[in-house]
Amino acid sequence: MNFKFFTNNSVNLIIAGFLLIFSYSCQNAENDSTKLKDPNFSYENYKPSGNEIIISRSEYVNKLKGFWLAQCIANWTGLVTEMDKIGNIGEIKTGEFYTRDDWGKEDQPAYWGGTKDFSRTIDFVFEGDDGNWGADDDTDIEYIYQHLLYTNKVSKLSGNQIRDGWLKHIKNEEENFLWVSNQRALDLMISGTIPPETSNPEKNPDFDMIDAQLTTEIFGFFSPARPDFAVEMAELPIQTTARFNAEWISKFYVSMYSMAANADPNLSIKDNLISFAEKSRKELPDDSYASKMYDFVKKQYYDGIPWETIRDNVYQRYQVEQKDGYDLTSRNMRCNACAAAGINFAASIVSLFAGEGDLKETIKIGSLAGWDSDNPTATWGGLIGFMIGADGVEKAFDRTFSEEYNIHRTRQNFPNGIDNFTNMANIGVFITDRVIQNELGGGVDLVKNLWYIPKSN
């Protein structure tokens, strides 16, 4: 045996094998990193300046999946108690509000006398691996806006694009799962009115209802860590149905959602949420009843008052005594304006503070707080779900869930009536790619799968 010949050939074979493996690995890595690439968008080269916020796109997919999943859990759980407890003013009286002791007990009828077929018990509502989550107005309008942004290839929708999208995807003659200001806006669109005129108080008397705050939070995720542009991006969709306090409240939520993309890893979920809320408080003018509601609930929380008592105090102060300029009771509206932006915002701040960043506890408190209880639960469930990601949501509940979403339960004319959270999250990332590159002056690194987001001035 020629030892020298054997050694040289062995080395050559080893080197050749290594190069082959290295080449294959690099090719796979490149394929993996560029898999999440929008075929309808032209990515530009970007040279980081070193003064950007850096966010992983792959982690963002998991976070957006967590948003959709937790929002669906929270939405459907909150629907169990929706409008069960709205107070005792006027002709409609619903008795004492729920407390923590009512969790796990039989659900009481809503104020109109209806019961919920999907659950007779006040408890979490889940969809197993073999099912699909039903759309509701807390998720489906956000789905429409995401679809419109992507298919129109824009970062900011025009009034005509919003109107055309609503008329295409929202039913008119049949049950359409719209209420108060959303329904008024649709009726105005049908007659030819274009947003933002659809929320003009002279045309839409429901301009101060809850609608916009449950349909526009998602815009915050499309402008990660840049609430300045997130609020700008969401302004017209918000003004499609809301003005004044209802508009400011919606911008508060959008701002918080945007900030969640750059949470401080050294802080707890609770402390991050409070930080987002405190910074987003600037969206609420100091002389607005919305800002006073926020401050009122916050003070009582830090005074150590139980959440049930804070909620009761909110009811007494704002619906009974009509303090801080909140005069909706005097307007003698149906169910004492139980779907108003203000009272439901105050209830949501109760569950935000008292839930202390715990997903399950926040959903519980939101469900038991009263009024339009599926809305605050969906808002905070979606936000916390985003912060902990889809895997974190499943860990919190110690189980797995379906990720299929039935948009055609409530809406129409989409390519896929049954969508899934992974696809929905990918579309969200593509929209965010466009915002970061075209609006924020940042960059998308498809190889490293990173966003570079310039900090605001």
Model-derived segments and their meaning:
Residues 51-55, 186-207, 216-226, 235-240, ...:
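Accessory "access/gating" subregions that flank catalytic or transport cores
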Residues 2-14:
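Bacterial N-terminal signal peptides that target proteins for export
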Residues 69, 131-137, 141, 146-250:
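Active-site cavity-forming subdomains of large catalytic enzyme subunits
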Residues 27-33:
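Bacterial lipoprotein signal-peptidase II cleavage site
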Residues 73, 77, 84-102, 242-245, ...:
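Catalytic phosphate/nucleotide-handling subdomain of diverse soluble enzymes
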Residues 79-126, 139-141, 163, 173-176:
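Active-site-surrounding "flap" and adjacent substrate/cofactor-binding loops of secreted or lumenal enzymes
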Residues 22-25:
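C-terminal motif of bacterial Sec signal peptides marking the signal peptidase cleavage site
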Residues 111-136, 407-436:
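A structural-propensity feature for long, helix-poor, extended segments
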